């Protein structure tokens, strides 16, 4: 094993990278509330893992969506557990994100020179809420259907372009298969990709600038 490690070490300088990560200075004022962002990240990873597992059985069609969710809950081995963990971690992600925003705001973590870190964090907050909105509709039950109908109908109040936005979100004039397909694509591909990109930016800026000082 040592020869293999030495081979990689010679080319990638693994030890130098590990030392840089492990030796990063942590200010003495940091407490447990500074871990809230990390909990959001862990919740996101759980979401990705459990969501990916469910894509093997979920069918994003109006006729089969609800039945496929029932199948996951009743017939798939540990399907009930995987979906439950997905739901619980989703709630945890939203809650921890809200608490994280409050912590950053109350400790002044949004001030110069960390404005861009704050902006990426706000974008991540919007993406987190979008996860909830799109995921809520995927079982395509009565609650999901009417939630989608209400949410996608909100932009109709926007002057001039409101009707076009509604049709874009719904994939047509009314809520149907086009809507479910759009929400499924957003929930499983677009939003995770955007979240991963902005999380990387967020972490790199925190790594560069360090944790903000006490008030």
UniProtKB/Swiss-Prot annotation:
Keywords tagged on the record: Chloroplast, Electron transport, Heme, Iron, Membrane, Metal-binding, Photosynthesis, Plastid, Thylakoid, Transmembrane, Transmembrane helix, Transport
Keyword Electron transport in record: yes
Cell compartments where the protein resides: Plastid, Chloroplast thylakoid membrane
Transmembrane segments: 32-52, 90-110, 116-136, 186-206
CC terms in the record's Gene Ontology section: chloroplast thylakoid membrane
Cofactor descriptive note: Binds 2 heme b groups non-covalently with two histidine residues as axial ligands. Binds one heme group covalently by a single cysteine link with no axial amino acid ligand. This heme was named heme ci.
Entry keyword Chloroplast: yes
Membrane topology: Multi-pass membrane protein
Major place of residence: plastid
InterPro entries, per database record: Cyt_b/b6_N, Cyt_B6_PetB, Cytb/b6-like_sf, Cytochrome_b_N_euk/bac, Di-haem_cyt_TM
GO MF: electron transporter, transferring electrons within cytochrome b6/f complex of photosystem II activity; metal ion binding; oxidoreductase activity
Note: Heme 1 (or BH or b566) is high-potential and absorbs at about 566 nm, and heme 2 (or BL or b562) is low-potential and absorbs at about 562 nm.
Protein family per UniProt: Belongs to the cytochrome b family. PetB subfamily.
PANTHER family given in the database record: CYTOCHROME B
NCBIfam families reported for this sequence: PRK03735.1
Record note on quaternary structure: The 4 large subunits of the cytochrome b6-f complex are cytochrome b6, subunit IV (17 kDa polypeptide, PetD), cytochrome f and the Rieske protein, while the 4 small subunits are PetG, PetL, PetM and PetN. The complex functions as a dimer.
Protein name: Cytochrome b6
Organism, scientific name: Porphyra purpurea
């Amino acid at each position: 094993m040592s020869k293999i490690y030495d081979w990689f070490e010679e080319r990638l300088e693994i030890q130098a990278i590990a030392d840089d990560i492990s030796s990063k200075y942590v200010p003495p004022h940091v407490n447990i509330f500074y871990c809230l962002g990390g909990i959001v990240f862990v919740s996101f990873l759980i979401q990705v893992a459990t969501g990916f597992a469910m894509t093997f059985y979920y069918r994003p069609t109006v006729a089969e969506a609800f039945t496929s969710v029932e199948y996951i809950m009743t017939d798939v081995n540990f399907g009930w557990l995987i979906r439950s963990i997905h739901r619980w971690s989703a709630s945890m992600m939203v809650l921890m994100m809200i608490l994280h925003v409050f912590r950053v705001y109350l400790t002044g973590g949004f001030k110069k020179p960390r404005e861009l870190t704050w902006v990426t964090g706000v974008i991540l907050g919007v993406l987190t809420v979008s996860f909830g909105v799109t995921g809520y509709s995927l079982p395509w039950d009565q609650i999901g259907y009417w939630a989608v109908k209400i949410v996608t109908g909100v932009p109709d109040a926007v002057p001039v372009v409101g009707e076009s936005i509604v049709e874009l979100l719904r994939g047509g004039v009314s809520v149907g298969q086009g809507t479910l397909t759009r929400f499924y694509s957003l929930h499983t591909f677009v939003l995770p990709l955007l979240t991963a990109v902005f999380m990387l930016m967020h972490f790199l800026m925190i790594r560069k600038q360090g944790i903000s000082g006490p008030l």
